[in-house]
């Protein structure tokens, strides 16, 4: 059986409040499962302005019309406006995802803080950020999270073993080609099994190489039409596919089903694997076409199919 796992990153209050219910409806209409990974603390999206000097960031912003997708108000949270506490305000919405049969997991505590700072922070800072997220998850759901997916695919050396210490069973923190066991230079396992994102995201594709919202689904479906590999992980965003790119996502769901893919969450993909038999790979720092900056990638593989 060919399995394509849908990983939904929920970055903002707006995405949680408005994007999540739209995605739930779309998934149910198309008999698809998915994993929703939540940002559980404050929405400080406005502080992402610090990325303006990062090579490629302003180009990505202009290509994907950030204001159109996120709205002015969200882009002021954490700067001119106080950042709403997402987990406090939207606990019932998050529980509704679980109650409708979808996997829920941890994305982060503070999305912008983690994505922009984790690479330079120490173990104590990292532990505190992950502790806050795990504790809030427990308050909302009454159980411990099984899956972690790092904001912006950003990690540091301390975060890998912390996932195991905090009893995550598997994670999707990286970009890569297939599931693997992360190891250090000596071949020692450093964390839980990784289910990396294998396909490009819409915001990486649109605006480059002639890709638009009208043909992005066709470009992605061309990548998944091949007979191999038999598994993929696609990351989508509640603010994009749960917003103005909802029609693109619906076309993708229909197209994947027509190609014979079973659409699962990360839990469904992990359950189909023998975790002990997964190949070992080091985690590297690399780049992905269409995304600014560096991120965690599976070593010795292509970190993401090009559109």
Spans of features found by a protein language model:
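Catalytic alpha-helical scaffold of carbohydrate-active enzymes acting on polysaccharides/glycoconjugates
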Residues: 1-147, 152-193, 213-234, 242-307
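C-terminal active-site rim and adjoining tail of enzyme catalytic domains
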Residues: 237
